[in-house]
Amino acid sequence: MQFSNLDTLRTRGTRKWTQFDDDVIPMFVAESDFPTAPAIKEAIIDACEREMFGYTPAPHAHHLGEAVADFYDWRYGWRPDAAKIFPVADVVRGVLLAIQYFTDGDVIVPVPAYFPFLPIAEAAGRNRIDISSDKGLEGGLDMAEVEEAFKNGAGSIIVTNPFNPGGWMFTSEELDQICDIARRYKGRVLVDEIHAPLTYGKRHVCAAANNPDVCITVTATSKAWNVAGLKCAQMIFTNDEDVKTWNAINPVAKDGVGTLGIIAAEAAYESGREHLDWQVEQLKANRDWLVENLPSLIPGIRFEIPDATYLMFLDFKDTKLGVDKPAAYLLKHARVALSEGVDFGPGGEHRARMNFATSPEILKEATERIARAIEVV
């Protein structure tokens, strides 16, 4: 697979490549630098040639639900009911709708968290209850803390699996525990599985497989196939009452899905599997390179080795840098853009998130820039 160089990547013109000056290597927002899967490009080109630029096809005229169900069966060993899968603009919108229409009470958010989930409770007119996502060296939740939050009035918990920014994965036992707690307090478990296709060795576990009554799952092809701008995530419901609730929601609230997004998602799930496997292989190589080289390049650096995602949460507290906002320093002095740890909420101090979904050459250059900038502190 051929990688694009920085000059070519900048011509993409997306947020990643327009946020900063051209001398900055962007490794912040979760966009991949990998080439688009041929099956997706072919499907989009075909749709463009047919001038498929109008409103989304009628539900009976596309097969997105079947494509998602087949992919889940192949990748995770669990097949959801295709008739209970519905498109939604993006994962954040899906989680917001789940809070607004399917839950009561406060929202539990494990922090540090994917930063759009920090204000989502307020957007839904609810309060946020923070719990730590840093239990143990490899991340995880303290179930006593989860239960206490539900006991204190929470009606739902957002479970990002695989976790962003840490890159760790929930076990089947942990998911069942969370769901059992939610069930006891008549709460809901809102599961974000957007990074689930990108795992290294371990198989992703779907919380809803064992807990269809309390889970609402939201996923998308946005991260694994880099098509976030096409706007098509998927709500996966696993009980009939939730489907009835979804169908009763005002269509204005559910609007925003892109026609080309449906086309791209179907192509990704059905014909993008080989490309996905190649990406995972390359991402694992990038991750392993970082694990091997970061400690010598940046003495004192600490990090969780991600089991999934293309994101690594770096802790600079014991390096020569040792500031609360390392990304700001590195943007100025290394000309590398990372995501600031404090933007992920409490527990993000001294940390920064690195997106390593790029070529080995760009990854090496960016890491060496960071090392040089810290060395002269």
Curated annotation (Swiss-Prot):
Reactions accelerated catalytically: an S-substituted L-cysteine + H2O = a thiol + pyruvate + NH4(+); S-(1-hydroxy-3-methylhexan-3-yl)-L-cysteine + H2O = 3-methyl-3-sulfanylhexan-1-ol + pyruvate + NH4(+); S-3-(hexan-1-ol)-L-cysteine + H2O = 3-sulfanyl-1-hexanol + pyruvate + NH4(+); S-(4-hydroxy-3-methylbutan-2-yl)-L-cysteine + H2O = 2-methyl-3-sulfanylbutan-1-ol + pyruvate + NH4(+)
Cofactor(s) required for function per UniProt: pyridoxal 5'-phosphate
Keyword annotations: Aminotransferase, Lyase, Pyridoxal phosphate, Transferase
Top-level EC class: lyase
GO molecular function: cysteine-S-conjugate beta-lyase activity; pyridoxal phosphate binding; transaminase activity
Gene Ontology biological-process entries: biosynthetic process
Origin organism lineage: Bacteria, Bacillati, Actinomycetota, Actinomycetes, Mycobacteriales
Family from the record: Belongs to the class-II pyridoxal-phosphate-dependent aminotransferase family. MalY/PatB cystathionine beta-lyase subfamily.
Enzyme Commission number: 4.4.1.13
Pfam family name, one: Aminotran_1_2
Name this polypeptide is given: Cysteine-S-conjugate beta-lyase
Membrane spanning residue stretches: none
Function: Catalyzes the cleavage of the cysteine-S bond in various cysteine-S-conjugates. Cleaves L-cystathionine, as well as S-substituted cysteine conjugates S-benzyl-L-cysteine and S-ethyl-L-cysteine. Releases four human body odoriferous sulfanylalkanols: 3-methyl-3-sulfanylhexan-1-ol (3M3SH), 3-sulfanylhexan-1-ol, 2-methyl-3-sulfanylbutan-1-ol and 3-sulfanylpentan-1-ol; the release is obtained after the sequential hydrolysis of the Cys-Gly bond of the odorless Cys-Gly-S-conjugate precursors by the dipeptidase TpdA, then the cleavage of the resulting Cys-S-conjugates by MetC.
Entries under SUPFAM superfamilies matching the protein: PLP-dependent transferases
Keyword Nucleotidyltransferase applies: no
